[in-house]
């Protein structure tokens, strides 16, 4: 029976929540944890070890070393610069490129040949940075993309229609950020368009605007109150890791590298993607409305502009 090993880089709010979920579900045989704060990594390892008796399967959790990368199936990168007050996710770019370039080079030099999974913001651009620095094939690098935004969209719609969130299909695509696109043309419950399920006197545009704005804004609202968002995104990462390790063939809206899909090329962006043992196996092209497609292209233009800035920073470093 195949043994599964992951390395987690960054044991902050997101990383530790992810690690706890991995232990609770017993998804892997071994998990190595690396953090710039070695005492924090050590303390998390001890704490997680004491949780293993309650997990579904035993996970060997230990402090990671350079040697751990070589035989890992997946490296999950939760390391990130801190988001300063008033900054957007995209403003994190320069600091995180400075962190990522030497880190990715070292991981690749170790002989690692598995999959990179990351939520670090700006996640679409950082996914591109990992691809450029590692020179790995596109399927081996998966950013969390708009998976969390999609979950938020599902949740808000589920409250409106009094159904479980996982019974709502409502994709968010594009940038994980302000230019994200709510795909109302494909939002469904039990196969029925959600807009058709509303009372006949509903102001549809007002309803759509309200839900879309709440979906975009809620991350900032959470951040203002607790300084981070970590529970939803950590479970998104768990779902991605599980899909790769166990060939789940699930579809998630993650940061994938498009090469012609949706009329876009050479950009990491949130799109529906089949995830299995091949990583980001293939992109699903939804039939978007003209407005949605235009919004997606606008979102891609924003990401591409920052990708060019990332390229300039990398060129100076390498």
UniProtKB/Swiss-Prot annotation:
Any GO BP: glycolytic process
Positions of the catalytic residues: 176
Entry keyword set: Cytoplasm, NAD, Oxidoreductase, Phosphoprotein
Record flagged with keyword Cytoplasm: yes
Quaternary organization: Homotetramer.
Signal peptide: none
Binding locations of substrate: 89, 121-124, 149-152, 229
Role noted for this protein: Catalyzes the conversion of lactate to pyruvate.
Protein name: L-lactate dehydrogenase
UniProt cross-references to InterPro entries, sorted A to Z: L-lactate/malate_DH, L-lactate_DH, L-lactate_DH_AS, Lactate/malate_DH_C, Lactate/malate_DH_N, Lactate_DH/Glyco_Ohase_4_C, NAD(P)-bd_dom_sf
Any one GO molecular function term: L-lactate dehydrogenase activity
Pfam families assigned to the protein according to its UniProt record, in alphabetical order: Ldh_1_C (PF02866), Ldh_1_N (PF00056)
Chain segments annotated as coiled-coil in the UniProt record: none
Family per record: Belongs to the LDH/MDH superfamily. LDH family.
Pathway noted in the entry: Fermentation; pyruvate fermentation to lactate; (S)-lactate from pyruvate: step 1/1
A single Gene Ontology CC term: cytoplasm
Reactions it catalyzes: (S)-lactate + NAD(+) = pyruvate + NADH + H(+)
Subcellular location: Cytoplasm
Location, primary (coarse class): cytoplasm
In-chain residues carrying the UniProt-annotated modification Phosphotyrosine: 220
